[in-house]
Amino acid sequence: MKTGLFILIAGIFCVLLNDSLLFLQIRRYFKRKICSYLFWLHSLFFVACIVWYHLFIPTLKGPEAYFWVEKCISIILLFYTPKTLYIIVNAFSILLRMAKCIPAARIVNRLALGIALASFIVILNGITWYRYSYKIERETVCIKTLPDAFNDFRIVQLTDLHLGSYGEHYPGITKLVDEVNRLNPDLIVFTGDMVNSFA
């Protein structure tokens, strides 16, 4: 079996298993059938995303294509990491409910919801605002043997840009250039992870 096909089958299996376990845990909250239909419709959407990802990978030609594939993976992680955490933690709530420890079961259930929500917010922040925020760290290096001509010599080091993550029309690149120019460097060096899978 080819690796790509294995990943496709494993991905679909994980999505359906995850959603099936989640549905068993929360179906008592669904008062109408439409809620169940919407739940499985959203599950089928992610199955379609995995199939699209599998078909799209061989056609990758440049960073823009890679950008959208990365977005697809990020969206899947955004939803299924919180779901998985909720399923695991809420399993203890179910066990407590079976043991007739209803107050403790409710506390654990709320804890599961809190953990799932927190992970959703953290991942959302990571794939949207935080990943594109530039951080400036200033260091002063004193070298006594350096000629006087190099006093106040400024070096700007750019690292871990991962340009393939931005997409073709990302305006933050202009912001980055302006920020570097504002620092008024004498020398600019590029180190480490300038690109992703594509140059």
What role is predicted for each listed range?
Residues 132-137, 142, 146-199:
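Membrane-embedded segments
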Residues 1-132:
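Non-catalytic terminal accessory segments
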